[in-house]
Design a protein with these regions (language model features):
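Rossmann-like NAD(P) dinucleotide-binding subdomain of oxidoreductase/dehydrogenase enzymes
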Residues: 96-203
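N-terminal Rossmann-like NAD(P)+-binding subdomain of aldehyde/semialdehyde dehydrogenases
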Residues: 1-103
C-alpha cells in the first residue's frame, strides 16, 4: 500500500437520512405504479451501462479493497453483471397476480422504501443483490455502503443515473454504521431493511 489518496467522500448524518427517505417516499408514488415491462427495460439499460463500465468498476474495487485485479474482474465486477442478468430473467417470469384455487386473487405489490446496508468485502456483489431486486419490484431505496469501500458505490450510483433510474428511486448515503446505519434501521418511514455485515453496520 502506498497510502496515496484514491478518492474523497462526505460522511452523511441523520439529516441526510431524513432527506433521502423523503425523496424515496416521493419517488415511490410514481415508481410503484410502473409496469413490469417498464422495469425490465430499465434493468436491461442498467446492464448495458454496467457492461460499459466493467473495467472501471473492477479497478475501483481493486484500489479500495486492495484485491488483485484478476479477482476484482472475475469475481467482484462479474458477479454484479451475473446477478443483474439473473434478476432480469426472474422478473420476466414473475406473475404479479395469481388466482388461487379458492378464487382468491394473490397480488404482489412493492413494499415501499427499502434501506440497504452493505459490507466492505463484496461491494458490488452485495449492492446489486439489494438494489436491483428493489428496483425490479417497483420499490425505492437508500443505500449505505461500507465506509471502507465507498468508491465502487459512487461509481454504481453514476451507472444507475446514466441508465435512467428516476430521481429519488435510488439514493446513496456514505457514513458510519453508528450514525447513518442506525438512522436507517430505526427510521419510521422505511418499510424494509436489508442488512449484511456485523452489528457495527448499524443495527
Amino acid at each position: 500500500a502506498t497510502e496515496e489518496e484514491i478518492g474523497t467522500i462526505i460522511l452523511g448524518n441523520n439529516d441526510d437520512v431524513d432527506i433521502a427517505v423523503k425523496a424515496a417516499n416521493l419517488a415511490f408514488d410514481n415508481f410503484s405504479k410502473t409496469t413490469k415491462e417498464d422495469r425490465l427495460k430499465l434493468l436491461k439499460r442498467i446492464h448495458e451501462v454496467t457492461s460499459d463500465c466493467f473495467e472501471e468498476l473492477a479497478q475501483a474495487m481493486s484500489k479500495e479493497m486492495g484485491a488483485p485485479i484478476t479477482m476484482s474482474r472475475e469475481a467482484q465486477a462479474d458477479s454484479g453483471l451475473g446477478h443483474l442478468q439473473g434478476f432480469i430473467e426472474a422478473l420476466e417470469k414473475l406473475e404479479e397476480e395469481n388466482t388461487l384455487s379458492n378464487g382468491d386473487i394473490l397480488t404482489k405489490e412493492p413494499i415501499g422504501v427499502c434501506g440497504l446496508i452493505t459490507p466492505w468485502n463484496w461491494p458490488i456483489n452485495q449492492i446489486t443483490l439489494k438494489v436491483l431486486p428493489a428496483i425490479a419490484c417497483g420499490c425505492t431505496c437508500i443505500l449505505k455502503p461500507s465506509e471502507h469501500t465507498p468508491i465502487s458505490a459512487m461509481l454504481y450510483a453514476e451507472i444507475l443515473h446514466e441508465a435512467g433510474v428516476p430521481s429519488g428511486v435510488f439514493n446513496l448515503i456514505h457514513g458510519t454504521g453508528e450514525e447513518v446505519g442506525v438512522a436507517l434501521s430505526r427510521h419510521p418511514d422505511i418499510q424494509m431493511i436489508s442488512f449484511t455485515g456485523s452489528t457495527r453496520g448499524g443495527m
